[in-house]
Structure formats: C-alpha cells, structure tokens
C-alpha cells in the first residue's frame, strides 16, 4: 500500500482519477487494471458535499463531475506514466475542464497490477490518496472473497463480524488502522453485519453489512466522518 498526501483536496482526488483514463486497448496483455474510489465528502471539509471534479488527461477532458461515493473501473492501463490536470468542477453551464487547474502531475502504473486508488481522509481528517492492491485470489468452493479498507477519519478500529440472525460474534479483526486493509473468505450470498468499534472496545461507532459473491472480490471502503454523519461504506466489485 502506497500513500500520497496532497495540499489540495481536488488535486488528490483527481490524481487518482487521472491515473485511470486512457485510450489503450481494453484487453492488451500486461496492462494494469485500475479502479478508483472517491471517498472524501466535501461536507467534512466545509465544501460542496459531493465535491465534484473534472479531469483532463494528456490534454483531453476525460472525466467530468466525479463525486463522493462514485467509483470508476476497471480500466486497462498500459505500463507507463500519464500526464494529468485537475480542474475544480464549475457550474453545469460551464464547459467541462474549464475550471481552475488545481494540480498537474505525472502518474505511473506498473504492468500486470490490479489496484485501487482511494481518495479519503486520514485518521486526523486530512485529505490523502492511498493505493491498495486488490486481492483477486479465488476463494474456496462455496465462499467468496471480501476485503475491508479503513479509509475513514477514525483511529484504529476492531471489525466485529456477525450474522443478522444471531448476536454471536463470528470473528474479530483487531486494530485496523486508517490506510490498512484486510481480506477474508465468507460464504457466498449471505449478508453479514460488520461493526466498527474503536480498537479495544465492543461498542460500535457504526454498523454496516457485507455480502460475498462467487467469482468476485467485493471490497468495502469505510469512508467519511461519524461526527459529521457522512460515514458510509462504498462497495467495489472486482472480477477474479
């Protein structure tokens, strides 16, 4: 996992987005498969709640009004570096990518990797972007692969796994810090309850639900603030 921090929020989101936009052949051998998740609520930073941005890549406007909780991917991306510019989204009547340029950057990706870039907040509430490798290892028969990523402005948490039909705890994943992820197998087509509790406690600060699916890695990103009521789980489904 690689983390980059940026001064401007729009810059960090767009840096992730711009990495994904390409006119490369869809099935070229050796390409990287890249996804991106917008996990920063503007409300947490006193900005427009959906925090839309536009992205130009190699001089062309490639993505417009990408908003909080949106996802993009997979994009087949040949190994190499991509020149991008990030624009703050203006009004709908304004041409795309005509807003102020927040940043210009060159972003590399390696051949053959399967990755997600997540724009999110650190445990102290500062904007950042983290690159995670996606675990696409096939699960055993009858199971599916679930990944959970701590990308919310919270200190380390314990993930407590339960079913909806019983109060019994099935598993506890302790001390997961902001910017970290875990991968596990769960029976497919069964919804499980995931409680987020501050590390060493049992009282959940938030509760979500997850569901494993055959042939996919289902990734859940915890994003947003509990204090400002923007906390949510963003689901991303990656083919194995």
What are these model-predicted stretches?
Residues 23-240:
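Intrinsically disordered, low-complexity polar regions and short flexible loop motifs
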Residues 10-19:
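Bacterial N-terminal signal peptides
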């Amino acid at each position: 996992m690689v983390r980059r921090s940026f001064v401007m929020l729009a810059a960090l989101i767009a840096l992730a987005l711009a990495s994904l936009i390409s006119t490369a052949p869809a099935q070229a051998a050796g390409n990287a498969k890249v996804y991106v998740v917008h996990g920063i609520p503007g409300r947490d930073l006193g900005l427009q709640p959906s925090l839309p941005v536009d992205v130009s890549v190699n001089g062309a406007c490639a993505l417009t009004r990408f908003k909080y909780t949106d996802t993009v991917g997979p994009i087949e991306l040949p190994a190499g570096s991509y020149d991008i510019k990030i624009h703050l989204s203006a009004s709908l009547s304004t041409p795309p990518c005509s807003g102020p340029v927040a940043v210009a950057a060159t972003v590399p990706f390696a051949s053959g990797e399967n990755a997600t870039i997540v724009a999110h907040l650190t445990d102290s509430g500062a904007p950042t972007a983290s690159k995670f490798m996606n675990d696409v290892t096939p699960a055993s028969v009858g199971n599916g692969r679930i990944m959970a990523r701590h990308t919310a402005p919270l200190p380390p948490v314990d993930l407590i796994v339960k079913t909806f039909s019983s109060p019994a705890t099935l598993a506890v994943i302790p001390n997961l810090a902001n910017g970290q992820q875990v991968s596990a197998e769960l029976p497919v087509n069964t919804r499980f309850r995931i409680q987020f509790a501050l590390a060493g406690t049992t009282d959940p600060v938030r509760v979500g639900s997850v569901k494993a699916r055959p042939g996919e890695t289902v990734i859940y990103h915890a994003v947003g603030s509990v204090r400002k009521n923007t906390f949510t789980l963003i689901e991303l489904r990656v083919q194995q």
